[in-house]
Amino acid sequence: MKGASGAVKKKPQVLNEAGEAETAVETVGESRKISGDGGFGSDDGGGGGGGGSGESILREIGDDRPTEDGDEEEEEDEDEDDGGDEEDEEGEGEGGQEERPKLDEGFYEIEAIRRKRVRKGKVQYLIKWRGWPETANTWEPLENLQSIADVIDAFEGSLKPGKPGRKRKRKYAGPHSQMKKKQRLTSTSHDATEKSDSSTSLNNSSLPDIPDPLDLSGSSLLNRDVEAKNAYVSNQVEANSGSVGMARQVRLIDNEKEYDPTLNELRGPVNNSNGAGCSQGGGIGSEGDNVRPNGLLKVYPKELDKNSRFIGAKRRKSGSVKRFKQDGSTSNNHTAPTDQNLTPDLTTLDSFGRIARMGNEYPGVMENCNLSQKTKIEELDITKILKPMSFTASVSDNVQEVLVTFLALRSDGKEALVDNRFLKAHNPHLLIEFYEQHLKYNRTP
């Protein structure tokens, strides 16, 4: 049956008032009337039926269904709103008052085609049966729907681009969308970096400024020294606030200065007294009574507090202590008998020619139990090398090491024994001058 809609439900046949058995067959967008003798009603009256205006309308005696034009308008609205889905006719709601059209055995009325799929290489359509709920929809193969080819063509046309349909393909934005996402991420990272830089500059602006020049008297010297270091680091960070990693470089520079032997020679060792200490020199730029005309610095004897938390490996970074190790045999021979008049705490002379208690981890610093004697300045630096006293040579790791002991004159006028290792670390110019004065050579024949 060409005009009949193929389906899968059974409906009872109904006799109209004239006693004629009519078979109602409807298609989406088309309804035809089949008379008892099997003729179709058409526009031109062909097929054995009477003529009608527009498409033939399925009617029963006493049936008040809307015209075909109204049905077409409803179908157009359904195509626009639901993408090809069709709603039930208005007369469907009045099914309780009037009887359904009669269908042949094995034929069922189709309301709409919902979806399309391909299973095992075969096309299937999801059919909505009129008068049945959505849960009763079934997937029908194309072979079962040959009688409603026009309905299938209309559904396929609704799936084409440019027309509303159930399937809506996702639009591919192309590579430009990825570029936009990358630009957004980049801008976000730049904003975060700018915020971190601004916060760093604000934090650095609150750091303390450089204090006044250091004074070498009293217990506030160590605190001033620490403040000066912190101010130096803060100024370096402010000057390079554009880079977050510059603070680490400033710390490395500070550590390099701690290991610089030349700077340590001018600074001299540090002594702590009740949590505070003093340096022999404030640095290269320190001037005053503590600097002699020959460029050497004076020693400020302080009491060494054993309970001070500053005692430890912090000041052991000095290059002289790491580079030259104390020789036990030399230190035993360097005790001078001329130190009888000193206090019992200061009667030990170390291998470097300076007075210090045995076991003192800061060689060259003089200890005194009485804090009132801190105003007495005793110059203990070596001022002149008098003559060599002994010579020892040793070989370690196939390298010959020579140790020469000299009799030297201290700044207090007393003589002391020192070795060439100490002179290399603390008084290299005196050692070089002595070598130049006593240099001898023989001409080769």
Curated annotation (Swiss-Prot):
Region called Disordered, residue ranges: 1-108, 156-218, 267-291, 308-346
Gene3D superfamilies cross-referenced by the UniProt entry: 2.40.50.40
Biological process per Gene Ontology, one example term: negative regulation of DNA-templated transcription
GO MF terms held by the record: chromatin binding; DNA binding; GTP cyclohydrolase II activity; identical protein binding; methylated histone binding; sequence-specific DNA binding
Described purpose of this protein according to its UniProt entry: Structural component of heterochromatin involved in gene repression, including several floral homeotic genes and FLT that regulates flowering time. Required for maintenance of vernalization-induced repression of FLC. As part of the PRC1-like complex, recognizes and binds histone H3 tails methylated at 'Lys-9' (H3K9me) and 'Lys-27' (H3K27me), leading to epigenetic repression. PcG PRC1 complex maintains the transcriptionally repressive state of many genes, including Hox genes, throughout development.
Subunit note: Homodimer. Interacts with CYP71. Interacts with histone H3 and CMT3. Interacts with SUVH. Component of the PRC1-like complex, at least composed of RING1A, RING1B and LHP1. Binds to POL2A. Interacts with DUF7/AIP1. Binds to LIF2 in the nucleus on a common set of chromatin regions. Interacts with PDP3, MSI4/FVE and MSI5. Component of the PRC2 (polycomb repressive complex 2) complex which regulates histone methylation on histone H3K27. Interacts with EOL1.
Annotated protein name in UniProt: Chromo domain-containing protein LHP1
UniProt organism field: Arabidopsis thaliana
Recorded name of the encoding gene: LHP1
